[in-house]
Structures are given as C-alpha cells and as structure tokens.
Swiss-Prot record:
Catalytic residues (positions): 53 (nucleophile)
Broadest EC class assigned to this enzyme: isomerase
UniProt cross-references to CDD domains, sorted A to Z: PseudoU_synth_EcTruA
Organism: Bacillus cereus (strain ATCC 10987 / NRS 248)
Annotated positions binding substrate: 111
Listed InterPro entries: PsdUridine_synth_cat_dom_sf (IPR020103), PsdUridine_synth_TruA (IPR001406), PsdUridine_synth_TruA_a/b_dom (IPR020097), PsdUridine_synth_TruA_C (IPR020095), TruA/RsuA/RluB/E/F_N (IPR020094)
Record flagged with keyword ATP-binding: no
Self-association and partners: Homodimer.
Protein name per UniProt: tRNA pseudouridine synthase A 1
EC nos: 5.4.99.12
Keyword flag Isomerase: yes
C-alpha cells in the first residue's frame, strides 16, 4: 500500500464545506468519488488537515489516502485532475511513509481573509472577498492585533457549535496587508477553532469601525464568552492558505 499526500485547491462557493454531508455537495465527496472511479468501484477514504465550512476556499488544503495502486506522483496528479470537477484541483502529489498523517501531523496552518474596502460591490470578486462599505481606522486594527498573538483560551472567539473541549490555541503571526482596495488578514497558528478566524476578523473590523476599543481585546479573551466578541465575518472571504507538517 502507498500513502499518497495531495495538496488541494478549491473554490468553496458551491460546496457545503469540506466534510461529507448527506444530500449536500462537499469537497471530500467529490475527491472520494474520483478515487472510487480510479479504484474500480472500491471506496477509498481520505483524511484531511481539517474541515472548511460552506463557501470557504482553499489554496493549500492537504489530504492523504492509502492505495494498492502503483502509480507515479505525476500520474496520480493527472488522473485525479481528469476525474475531479473544475472547482477542485490537485496542485501537488507526494508519496509518504505511513507515519505521515494529514490531520494529526499538522504543525501549523495559515489562513488568509480578504476584505474589499468599497461602497460598490465588485461583480467579479463578490464570491471571493467580503465587501465592507464602512470607513475603517486601520491604526486601531493594527493596535488590536498583537493582543491575539501567543497562547490563549479562544472561547470568546469560536462558535458555540465547536466540539473541541480544549479551546487553547497558539497564534504565531497575524499580518495585516493593505493591497490596493483590499485588506488581507494573514493568520498563522498551531490550529484554529470552529469559526475562530472569521470571528477574529469580524472583531477587528468592529475595532476599525470604532465599535470596540483596541485595548478591550484582553478583557474579551478573559471573559471566555462568545457574546463579547464581534460579529462573524462571512465564509467566502476566507482561504485555507497553507498547512505545514513536523515530519
């Protein structure tokens, strides 16, 4: 058996997230459907670095699967991309040892969130950025960002629907990039809770709008209560950008 690692990019707009759900189109479902065709009807389960929600995109999702087929890496790449729909692309294939695990071996993840600063919607970017029509005080956002960096209990910044009991995570970097008419929030951490990046972005936008004080972030973290943080930003501005492994 070979263990195959794939890096996957997808446009999340027409998926109900990554993970298989009955009666809904998902990324995992499409990948496993393609693998089933290649394995002559045999079901092949894939493991992913993590789930993404409905409408969330990925540039660097990572999956693995085990297979009895002996194909070269380039052959896997070509075969899968031939079988997959246009909104999913395998960008890299690597053969790994059985010690590699797409989920349990993750060392750090990078997410990016795109905000379009415009009162007018952009018809060509509407599915890929969060259009934000209100003026923002960028310096206030920059002042708030360092409070999130480090190891914290992020209960205030995750959905109540999370199934994780341990809400402690470490954020290594948050970078705010001003690029033409967009703000791009770049997050690097050892892991992120359900909706955590989107709630942090929504909170930072509330800071930029003057609804929250930048110096209120430590208090919101300490309260460990979702109701004190800002609104959650929508899914279509979020990208799983890159996943790094310790092996």
């Amino acid at each position: 058996m070979d263990r195959i690692k794939c890096t996957v990019a997808y446009d999340g707009m027409h998926f109900c997230g990554y993970q298989i759900q009955p009666q809904h189109r998902t990324v995992q479902q499409e990948i496993e459907k393609a693998l089933q065709k290649l394995h002559k009807g045999e079901l092949v389960r894939v493991q992913a670095s993590g789930r993404t929600d409905s409408t969330v995109h990925a540039k660097g999702q990572v999956i693995h699967f085990d297979t009895p087929l002996s194909l070269e890496e380039w052959q896997w790449n070509n075969a899968l991309n031939t079988m997959l729909p246009d909104d999913i692309v395998i960008t890299q294939v690597e053969k790994k040892t059985e010690e590699f695990h797409a989920r349990y071996g993750v060392e750090r993840k990078e997410y990016r969130y795109r905000v379009l600063l415009s009162k007018t919607a952009d018809v060509f970017r509407r599915n890929y950025v969060y259009q934000y029509p209100y003026p923002l005080e960028i310096n206030a956002i920059r002042k708030a960002i360092p409070y999130f960096i480090g190891t914290h209990d992020f209960t205030s910044f995750c959905s109540a629907k999370t199934d994780k009991k341990d809400k402690v995570r470490t954020i290594y970097e948050i970078e705010l990039i001003e690029q033409d008419d967009e703000l791009i929030f770049r997050f690097v951490g050892n892991g992120f809770l359900y909706n955590m990046v989107r709630i942090i972005v929504g909170t930072l936008l509330s800071v930029g709008q003057g609804k929250l004080d930048p110096d209120s972030i430590p208090e919101i973290l300490a309260k460990q209560n979702r109701q004190f943080a800002g609104k959650m930003a929508p899914g279509h501005g979020l990208y799983l950008w890159q996943v790094n492994y310790n092996n």
